[in-house]
Swiss-Prot record:
Name the record gives this protein: 2-succinyl-5-enolpyruvyl-6-hydroxy-3-cyclohexene-1-carboxylate synthase
Cofactor(s), names only, from the UniProt record: Mg(2+); Mn(2+); thiamine diphosphate
Swiss-Prot/TrEMBL catalytic activity: isochorismate + 2-oxoglutarate + H(+) = 5-enolpyruvoyl-6-hydroxy-2-succinyl-cyclohex-3-ene-1-carboxylate + CO2
A Gene Ontology molecular function term of the record: manganese ion binding
Origin species: Pectobacterium atrosepticum (strain SCRI 1043 / ATCC BAA-672) (Erwinia carotovora subsp. atroseptica)
GO biological process: menaquinone biosynthetic process
Source organism, top-level taxon: Bacteria
Family: Belongs to the TPP enzyme family. MenD subfamily.
Cofactor stoichiometry and binding remark: Binds 1 thiamine pyrophosphate per subunit.
Keywords: Magnesium, Manganese, Menaquinone biosynthesis, Metal-binding, Thiamine pyrophosphate, Transferase
Positions of disulphide bridges: none
Stated role: Catalyzes the thiamine diphosphate-dependent decarboxylation of 2-oxoglutarate and the subsequent addition of the resulting succinic semialdehyde-thiamine pyrophosphate anion to isochorismate to yield 2-succinyl-5-enolpyruvyl-6-hydroxy-3-cyclohexene-1-carboxylate (SEPHCHC).
Length: 560
């Protein structure tokens, strides 16, 4: 038997099986042990191949592709620590639901735990974070092709969210001429399957939406709607639905609901707002991953008669552990099955408080160029028919608290584990999936953490602006009660860098904006001229955190 040739046949069948389940994008890192998978992917015309030299970034590239395409995305890496570097992306996918198919090449069993090079224990490498795992045997024609395709089909049919880890051991030799006629009899046992686009094994799973029988009674009550991480279409529908009910909707930065009560993370500090919201008899939360500190505090402390959380991800998504109902359902389908009944708004005072807060924010930031002003004015920078990617740490909190994003405008972020790793890589994946003009915004430490992902931006299919807010360190810790004496050295960790050389190294356009006017003009030019621009905005380190705290204190002190 020619081991290298049969390895290719095995890998070819494996990848072809994945395409029958909607896999179009595959992300590949360089490696020798993964050669059968890589060459088979390159030969499969149904696959779009993406490459990156850093597996950690590669995983997040796949995450972004899956996030924006809403399709399963495959990843190929070689054995050893290459596979371990995918861990952060797998964790994030497990928390936010993107489907990743992780193909880790491995040494055969006789090379494990014996000192062989680049051989680690890859069984259960990612512990409980993948939704599913499939440990394949060493390729051999003694195993029927029908076993391989049906094993993949069964796993993919059950992959409704999160990652599927498929560990793929390959024995040497890995290279050699491919005899196109060898082992065709093994493949041809699948007959006319090769001429179809269907899986070999079609597992049918029916999940029927459960309509809440008492909804007609509850929709007559005083309700509050919390909108967390939902899609753009769902966010727009949710806003219209809540408005029909006459219920206040408090929208997160990732809700894409238009945030009809803007600046919620500021006005929730107002005593009258808190008092009014305590009158809610039912709270409905759609989607998880709420961002704002005061919104999270209110969500934790609220005590309605009923608390329902609706999301298509399974499991508990309520860290406050409310007594109530956890409804696993597509948000759009749930709204259709639970129509609104037009009611008179019961909490109009919140509209007045939110409007007053927004005016206060506008006035406070009108003439002060800095991180807070940039966050508040992000809507003015958005490309028409484009999308926004928001980083983590301080920047997402400022945008959540200060900006009012357009209803139905696509907004992406990694708010599962909320790490600062892989943000630029995820941004690259989001844009490749949609080919839309894209505005991204991250902090300086986030940019440093994923600096080599700037290489991925060189292949952007549409105009892209990456704003790096350089506040010289992790200034999110200025919002937290970290010990002042140790804050700078052990928490914020300022690096005193500028990003012009990084942009030049990867051949990207670079602008350092010194004023709002320069920043806005630069972004506008980028949308018309195209290309990729790294736009650095150097701000006072504590500007964003201090401004947010000042505004919260001002609103909390209002007497009427």
């Amino acid at each position: 038997m020619s081991t290298s040739v049969f390895n290719r046949r095995w890998a070819t069948l494996l990848l072809e099986s994945l395409t029958r389940h909607g896999v179009r994008h595959i992300c590949i890192a360089p490696g020798s042990r993964s050669t059968p998978l890589t060459l088979s992917a390159a030969d499969n015309h149904a696959l779009i191949c993406h490459t990156h030299f850093d597996e950690r970034g590669l995983g997040h590239l796949a995450l972004g592709l899956a996030k924006a395409s809403r399709e399963p995305v495959a990843i190929i890496v070689t054995s050893g620590t290459a596979a371990a570097n995918l861990y952060p992306a797998i964790i994030e996918a497990g928390l936010t639901g993107e489907r990743l198919v992780v193909l880790t090449a491995d040494r055969p069993p006789e090379l494990i735990d014996c000192g062989a090079n680049q051989a680690i224990r890859q069984h259960a490498l990612y512990a409980s974070h993948p939704t599913l795992a499939l440990d394949l045997p060493r390729p051999t024609p003694d195993i029927p092709a029908t076993w391989l395709v049906s094993s993949v089909d069964s796993a993919m049919a059950r992959l409704t969210h999160g990652a599927l880890h498929i560990n793929c051991p390959f024995a040497e030799p890995l290279y050699g001429a491919d005899d196109g006629t060898a082992y065709q009899d093994w493949l041809m046992t699948l007959g006319d399957w090769w001429n179809s686009r269907e899986p070999w094994l079609r597992e049918m799973r029916q999940s029927t939406l459960v309509v809440q029988p008492d909804w007609p009674q509850w929709r007559q009550k005083r309700g509050v709607v919390l909108a967390g991480r939902v899609s753009a279409e769902q966010g727009a529908r949710l806003a219209a639905w809540a408005n029909e009910l006459g219920w206040p909707l408090i929208g997160d930065v990732l809700s894409q609901s238009g945030q009809p009560l803007p600046c919620a993370d500021i006005w929730l500090a107002h005593p009258e707002a808190a008092s009014l919201l305590r009158q809610a008899e039912i709270v409905l939360q759609f989607g998880g991953s709420l961002t704002g500190k005061r919104l999270l505090q209110w969500q934790e402390q609220c005590q309605p008669q009923e608390f329902w959380l609706i999301d298509d991800l399974p499991g508990r998504l309520d860290p406050a552990h409310h007594r109530g109902r956890r409804l696993v359902a597509d948000v759009g389908e749930w709204l259709s099955a639970h129509p609104a009944d037009k009611q008179t708004p019961w909490a109009d005072l919140l509209v007045d408080i939110a409007d007053r807060t927004q005016r206060q924010v506008d006035a406070h930031l009108a003439s002060h160029f800095g991180e807070a002003q940039l966050a508040q004015r992000i809507p003015a920078l958005l490309p028409p028919d484009g999308q926004l990617f928001v980083g983590n740490s301080l920047v997402v909190r400022l945008i959540d608290a200060l900006a009012q994003l357009p209803q139905g405008y696509p907004v992406y972020g990694n708010r599962g584990a909320s790490g600062i790793d892989g943000l630029i890589s995820t941004l690259a994946g989001v844009q490749r999936a949609t080919a839309k003009a894209t505005l991204g915004i991250v902090g300086d430490l986030s940019a440093l953490y994923d600096l080599n992902a700037l290489a991925l931006l060189r292949q952007s299919p549409a105009p892209l602006v990456l704003i790096v807010v350089n506040n010289n360190g992790g200034q999110i810790f200025s919002l937290l009660p970290t010990p002042v004496a140790q804050r700078e050295a052990f928490y914020c960790m300022p690096q005193n860098v500028e990003f012009g050389h990084a942009a030049a190294m990867f051949g990207l356009n670079y602008v350092r904006a010194e004023s709002w006017e320069q920043l806005a003009d630069t972004v506008s030019d980028c949308w018309t001229q195209g290309g990729v621009t790294l736009l650095e905005v150097v701000v006072e380190p504590k500007d964003g955190a201090e401004t947010l705290n000042e505004l919260v204190a001002q609103v909390a002190a209002w007497t009427h």
